[in-house]
Amino acid sequence: HYIAGFPERARGRFYNSAMLVGPSGVKAVYRKLHLFEREQEWFSPGDIPLAVHRVGPARVGMLICFDWRFPETARALALLGADVIAHPSNLVYPNAQEAMRVRALENRLCTVTANRTGTETRPGGSVPFTGRSQIIGPRGDVLVRARKAGDCAMAADIDLKVCRDKAL
């Protein structure tokens, strides 16, 4: 299984979306709820309810990029039973990765942020991305984190029993 972001066109609108793909094809789509700055010029806010999907023994929810800024979104996925939140991103704020550590800790689940690196040149300026893709454990611990620049592949063992133990 994998999760990837993509621009989606549906019913005459465009969405910033992510898809969960399994052996038999697309299993689920999530449309970003919280649009960032000028995204509203191109995309509509998501109109699909938050959901959790089975991936083997794990229950996985999805957020996209700026959704990190809204704790209730991660909490809603936790209340739906998520063990893991997958978070494909183009993060530009340097504190976003730390906020995802907090989301993991608040909700006792794992977060997996796949973030863009490098700089995009646009009319009127450039946008530097923060890199530092990461996998965070349910106690807010960094299981693995990439550097700010360059491509990489990462993996970490996740104990689902710990993700499901909500006792403090």
Question: What spans do the regions from the language model cover?
Answer:
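CN hydrolase (nitrilase-like) catalytic-core segments centered on the catalytic cysteine
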Residues: 1-3, 68-155
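Glycine-rich, aromatic-flanked loop segments that form ligand/cofactor-binding clefts
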Residues: 7-10, 118
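Active-site catalytic loop in hydrolytic enzyme cores
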Residues: 9-80, 89, 95-98, 102
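Short beta-strand element of the conserved SAM-dependent methyltransferase core
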Residues: 20, 53, 135-136, 156-158
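Short helix-loop capping/hinge motifs at secondary-structure junctions, enriched
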Residues: 25-28, 141-143, 163-165
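A short, polar/charged loop-to-alpha-helix boundary motif
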Residues: 32-45, 150-167
